[in-house]
Curated annotation (Swiss-Prot):
CDD domains per UniProt: SURF1
Major location category of this protein: mitochondrion
Taxonomic path: Eukaryota, Metazoa, Ecdysozoa, Nematoda, Chromadorea
Gene giving rise to this polypeptide: sft-1
Compartments where located: Mitochondrion inner membrane
InterPro entries attached to this UniProt entry: Surf1/Shy1 (IPR002994), Surf1/Surf4 (IPR045214)
GO BP term (any one): mitochondrial cytochrome c oxidase assembly
Name of the protein this chain belongs to: SURF1-like protein
Keyword list, A-Z: Membrane, Mitochondrion, Mitochondrion inner membrane, Transmembrane, Transmembrane helix
Amino acid sequence: MAFRWAIQMALRRGGGGGQRLLLTQHQHQNYQFFKTSSSTQFSTRNSQILDLDTPQKSPNFSENSKNKKSKKIEWSTGSILMLGLPAFAFSLGVWQIYRLIWKLELIEHLKSRLSQEAIELPDDLSSSSLEPLEYCRVRVTGEFLHQKEFVISPRGRFDPAKKTSASVGSMLSENEMSSHGGHLITPFRLKNTGKVILINRGWLPTFYFDPESHAKTNPQGTVILEAIVRKTEQRPQFVGQNVPEQGVWYYRDLEQMAKWHGTEPVWLDAAYETTVPGGPIGGQTNINVRNEHMNYLTTWFTLTLVTMLMWIHKFRK
């Protein structure tokens, strides 16, 4: 409105002023056109720059993304059956955990029995009476029948005083006696019943197997001693048969030993405190129970992981 009013006033005044106003009006229109055109071109250019800065997606991009997100397990009879392999391995691993706990509790139970106070050996020497007393400490009174002694060998040392063991390949014991030896078994007549049982007096090196070499250490007369109740053992693998006729004994077969030596099928391990200097070393009760369950459970759980990864790789598409 103000611009039009200025033109009208200039026309009224007449003269060159009107022409100058017309020129000014023309310049103003050119300026407005240039301003509009520049703004449009600048906006278009910025739009092109933004388009260049935007990452260009390949035609297969969306398809690949879709494929990655759409991987699923192919459930079928075969996949379900194959899933049984890791499941089976896992169940065995869990079972070995329970076995490990049981074995550790058993070892602790046996150790606690050895540390209990000694009780009198019952008069009833039947297996049903003595089996619950295995690894229990008992007290007996009687006399040794040294003329009937025999040796079971080879046997390592298991007494508390030893520093090394023949079972792990040692060559010398702490008192410098060869670790190659055996256990000296001597029949023992009970004072109260007159029955004869077998007592493992302890470990001897091979050069003391001759009865004359340890005769001076043999207890004489009536003695009172503490010992550990043991039961018979199965013949270990790769161990030969006993040969009683030749006095060769490899393992503890109570029925066979009792029949051959005319005793009750009862076996006691003399306590370590019964050791006589220069004689058999008592305390040969071995409670090192085999315990491989940790290795077993590690194997089964590793197999579970491997088979599960193989299953996922096979059936996840």
